[in-house]
Amino acid sequence: MSSWRKAKKSEQKHRLKRIARTRVQAFARDVRISAHKARRVIDQIRGRSYVETLTLLELMPYRASYPIFKLLYSAAASASHNLGFKEADSYISKAEVNEGAVLKRLKPRARGRSYLIKKPTCHITIVLKDRTLNEMSTPTSLS
């Protein structure tokens, strides 16, 4: 491998480390709720502050709000413990729901038949960022 290529790889590693220090990701895999129902909640909290989102999730009547609440709480705990983020300055920069595996079960019916029951799962991803770090990293124009 040429020295130019090694230098480029090293530069990419350092760039990824810088990005990793400014955000915290939390994943919930195989949550037993349909992706469509979880997206209904996720779409309402994307881009909001951490404190505002906790209030919203506590008041929402949807079943999907509890696993999302737990995941958000976990992400904030990781951010404050590992990177020293203040919870008041954190906001949700990215929140997405993807479909997971479908659990298939059989429901017995009359005359020896059976119907298929599909139990959908989903994967939830939440990324928290700190507003103060983003303000410091953006360059200001000199005019």
UniProtKB/Swiss-Prot annotation:
GO terms for molecular function: rRNA binding; structural constituent of ribosome. GO terms for cellular component: chloroplast; large ribosomal subunit. PROSITE patterns: RIBOSOMAL_L22. InterPro entries: Ribosomal_uL22, Ribosomal_uL22_bac/chlpt-type, Ribosomal_uL22_bac/org-type, Ribosomal_uL22_CS, Ribosomal_uL22_sf. It comes from the Eukaryota. The keyword Ribonucleoprotein applies. Belongs to the universal ribosomal protein uL22 family. Part of the 50S ribosomal subunit. NCBIfam families: rplV_bact (TIGR01044). This is Large ribosomal subunit protein uL22c. The lineage of its organism: Eukaryota, Viridiplantae, Streptophyta, Embryophyta, Tracheophyta.
